[in-house]
Amino acid sequence: MPEDVIELVVEPDAKGLRLDRYVADQVADLSRSYARQLIEDGHIRLNGGDARPSASVQPGDLVTVLRPIAQPTDLVAQDIPLNVVYEDADVVVVDKPAGMVVHPAPGHLDGTLVNALLARFPDITVGGDLRPGIVHRLDRDTSGLLVVTRNDRGRHAIQAQQLARTMTKAYLAVVDGRFKEPEGLIDAPLGRHPTDRLRQAVLASGREARTHYTVVEDLGDYTLIEARLETGRTHQIRVHFSHKSRPLLGDPLYGPRKPRATFGLTRQFLHAYRLGFALPSTGAWVEFRSPLPPDLQAALEKLRARAP
């Protein structure tokens, strides 16, 4: 089977990471379990030799990923409504509703964004595993924009922009609390929570994570903010603001066990409203915006009505 060759040079902030985790972090459409399988099958090499998934990587190490080129997926295409805001030969931009899982996983084997994409765009076969075309994700209950790649040219171009941190990924969020300054930066490394596998946490040994924010509207005890990702760690915005004692309104995982109020929300107030990147085909910069969905807009109006 033909292979796609990816060479990675380990940067200082990845020092000591397990090889399988490092590869999964660097190759956006590769899960950790699939990375482990590739290592065990000899398709991932560390400094030119075989390695174990648990091997620790060090700055300057060369990691070579020899990934079998994805064949048509066995996933089932499902005719699920999909809000496509842009498409060309290389990429698709979709506006994901809250409640939709991005890719199949235990407990969510169908009804996902991937199943819907395969019905609408059956040519999406890059990526293999259970995530064809997926190069970044949104949590199940986070709504908004994300880009999906349709071929290798699109995947390589978008991944290069992610690594160079040139993409724009901006979110609207309501947090519990106020800010003294109109804007700021949260620079706090993130990793898996030491005792709760469902959560991420700020850890000295974690990966670099940086979130820029700007106050959009003072809502009394709450604040509407724009959060912009410089890095893209799991649950990054939710963990960062919880760490600063400003948890997202309605967040069931990182918010208080007994929130002061919900304002009718059944999920966290977080919406990926702005997405910008250079088109793989031409290099032209494009930017897309998504309005707040009805549940978040209704909650915002309730917050405005009670604000002093």
Where do the PLM segments sit?
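RNA pseudouridine synthases
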Residues: M1-P308
